[in-house]
């Protein structure tokens, strides 16, 4: 009996110690009695609180702004904890936005099933949670029960977030739970208060795109008065779009003259973006500006033609029976390598270095026939030394009248063959 009595006394002591340990764990460890949660960005949250904060809820979920962040102190650095977040109703009202303010609008809907968001870093050591503010930047608010870490909320109801800290690694127990009144918000499917929208755009770096888009739309409404200066760098000849500093070639789409924006491809999309929205008339009226038509045509044509590295001079075979259309201009500062002289042979024009009628340099007969400009600077006569099928037999001399020049040139250009570009 003397041997059994010590064993009985030992069992009694062990059970008493275990009981005391359990009671101590329920009361909390001494190192966890001073746990504190403090809200980060409290000043910003207060600004939203004064305007009645709103949070967007969508079917797929929308992240919160401001982001809920809190600093934790008083945890055991070597113990394991999980941090959770849930949302509770802040009142028993359904809200509506009337005349610029939120007012109660009836009884609330039944509360949705309680959804708890577990921080993705959970579980972790107390040292981890205390080294930096705990951020709930990935939580998403939804108006549908989708799961996947989303919190379901009823639209037009006011909520208040709560942060919970649970100790894990043994017997799980809640050691802290705290909410912050300044983080209350009304769940909405679209912002109702414009001041809330402006405040979120101002402070949310991910909302700057909305502000930039608004500024771009405002700039588009301002008329562009520099169209005349921009127009001087472009020339429209028939179906051709000729930039002043690029290779000559047809445009990717035919020119539009109905005021619609021009959408060109390639490198011209950004360089000539201003031409899309404010496009001036491609040609001046030769009836109202007849005195300056010749000079304008030469200025535009010489400015639009590409440099010698992308387009060589026109190669037209010489012939003894050749009539010349001498065109002169008063501009002496023009340094273009293409003189204002068009030579028309007495026989059929044949492209040099290629088959007849082929297009080698991207230049078609539209370049010669596309312009409707009047040639007031042409010489007074066109001597023709030999008859040709290209000329009207009755055309031996052309007067200085503008109407005669226009009708004669129309008959001449109708029989011109395509001129090929050779290198």
Curated annotation (Swiss-Prot):
PROSITE patterns associated with the record: TBOX_1 (PS01283), TBOX_2 (PS01264), TBOX_3 (PS50252)
Coiled-coil annotated residue ranges, if any: none
Biased composition range(s): Polar residues: 290-304
UniProt keyword annotations, A-Z: Activator, Developmental protein, DNA-binding, Nucleus, Transcription, Transcription regulation, Wnt signaling pathway
CDD domains on file: T-box_TBXT_TBX19-like (cd20192)
GO-annotated molecular function: DNA binding; DNA-binding transcription factor activity, RNA polymerase II-specific; RNA polymerase II cis-regulatory region sequence-specific DNA binding; sequence-specific DNA binding; transcription cis-regulatory region binding
Region of interest (Disordered), residue spans: 215-234, 280-304
Gene3D superfamilies: Transcription factor, T-box
Subcellular location: Nucleus
GO cellular component: chromatin; nucleus
Record's keyword annotation contains Nucleus: yes
Residue ranges flagged as DNA-binding region: 44-212
Keyword Ligase carried by entry: no
Factors inducing expression: By mesoderm-inducing factor activin A.
Protein name: T-box transcription factor T-A
Species this chain originates from: Danio rerio
């Amino acid at each position: 009996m003397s041997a059994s009595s010590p064993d009985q006394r030992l069992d009694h002591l062990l059970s008493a110690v275990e009981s005391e340990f359990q009671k101590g764990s329920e009361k909390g460890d001494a190192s966890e009695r001073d746990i504190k949660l403090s809200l980060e960005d409290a000043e910003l949250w207060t600004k939203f609180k004064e305007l009645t904060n709103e949070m967007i809820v969508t079917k797929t979920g929308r992240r919160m702004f401001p982001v809920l962040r809190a600093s934790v102190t008083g945890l055991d650095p070597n113990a394991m904890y999980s941090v959770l977040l849930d949302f509770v109703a802040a009142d028993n009202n359904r809200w509506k936005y009337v005349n610029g303010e939120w007012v109660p609008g009836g009884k609330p809907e039944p509360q949705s099933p309680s959804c708890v968001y577990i921080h993705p870093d959970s579980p972790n050591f107390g040292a981890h949670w205390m080294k930096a503010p705990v951020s709930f930047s990935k939580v998403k608010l939804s108006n549908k029960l989708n799961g996947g870490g989303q919190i379901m909320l009823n639209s037009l109801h006011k909520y208040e977030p709560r942060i919970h800290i649970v100790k894990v690694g043994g017997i799980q127990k809640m050691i802290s739970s705290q909410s912050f009144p300044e983080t209350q918000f009304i769940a909405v499917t679209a912002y109702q208060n414009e001041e809330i929208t402006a405040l979120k755009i101002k402070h949310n770096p991910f909302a700057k795109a909305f502000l930039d888009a608004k500024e771009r739309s405002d700039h588009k409404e301002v008329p562009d008065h520099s169209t005349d200066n921009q127009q001087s760098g472009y020339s429209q000849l028939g179906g051709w779009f000729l930039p002043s500093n690029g290779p000559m070639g047809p445009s990717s789409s035919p020119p539009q003259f109905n005021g619609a924006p021009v959408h060109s491809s390639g490198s011209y999309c950004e360089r000539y973006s201003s031409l899309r929205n404010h496009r001036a008339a491609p040609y001046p009226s030769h009836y109202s500006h007849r005195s300056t038509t010749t000079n304008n045509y030469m200025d535009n044509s010489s400015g639009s033609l590409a440099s010698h590295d992308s387009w060589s001079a026109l190669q037209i075979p010489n012939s003894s029976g050749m009539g010349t259309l001498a065109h002169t201009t008063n501009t002496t500062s023009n340094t273009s390598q293409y003189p204002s002289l068009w030579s028309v042979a007495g026989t059929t024009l044949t492209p040099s270095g290629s088959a007849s009628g082929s297009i080698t340099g991207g230049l078609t007969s539209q370049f010669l026939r596309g312009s409707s400009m009047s040639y007031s600077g042409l010489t007074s006569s066109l001597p023709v030394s030999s008859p040709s099928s290209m000329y009207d037999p009755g055309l031996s001399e052309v007067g200085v009248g503008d109407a005669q020049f226009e009708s004669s040139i129309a008959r001449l250009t109708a029989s011109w063959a395509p001129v090929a570009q050779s290198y």
